């Protein structure tokens, strides 16, 4: 309060309070001359008690005369929001959970701006968060990695992938892939899928089911496992391509045929709903779906003909206690 070294406090300050007014009487006097050089500045804390929310006046006094007055406010602090409630954290976490990577600058700005445009409108934010979240689930990048992996397991081994299998393998499928108009991402993605498909083809679990089969048996068994019936012409064309083009550069192989059949549009449509449910558990809850929960959401999604908005699926997952507990 007194910046000049020619003052000293010679009496312990007295603190008093009257309602919203707090006074500190410090009893200051002039102090000059050689002895003033011995004065050492110090700080002292004063207990003014617990203050309720409101506006207060703090008076600094000397000899009962107010020399300075400060007004301040105590504001009630709401419970701290969880990190996932913030737009930046929400978007960043979706990149990690669904695309297995950090956000790229353009994508991050686009999605956070979508939420920022809502301002403080709670209903707008609720809908916006659902739409942003669903966009990741349905993004080209996730469809070409997460859904492709799901179909690989489901269409060849007749089972869903586990969460432990899904996480590292999806990361490999999406390695160095960022979907952007000015980036040759399709080339990298196709290369990643070729590598992954070849590795999957050589796994013991796959070979136990498909090794030793003729080309025709191999193709028929893949379609049978998928639950898809191709046209006779389509089936025969695939078999003939294997029979008459083996070991020739540019000709189909069992690996390339595997990828072709896994990407069959009829199979994609057939398993989309079950994949959507499974990948929500993997992405949001970071675990395998429990049987009851999986069947409940699959039945509901089927009842709404695949309309996840009307089924309120994304909303249910991102507002669930289990999801929010991930971000204390």
Q: At which residue positions do the language-model features occur?
A:
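Exposed, flexible binding/inhibitory loops of compact, secreted disulfide-stabilized domains
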Residues: 1-78
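Composition-driven recognition of low-complexity segments enriched
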Residues: 78-328
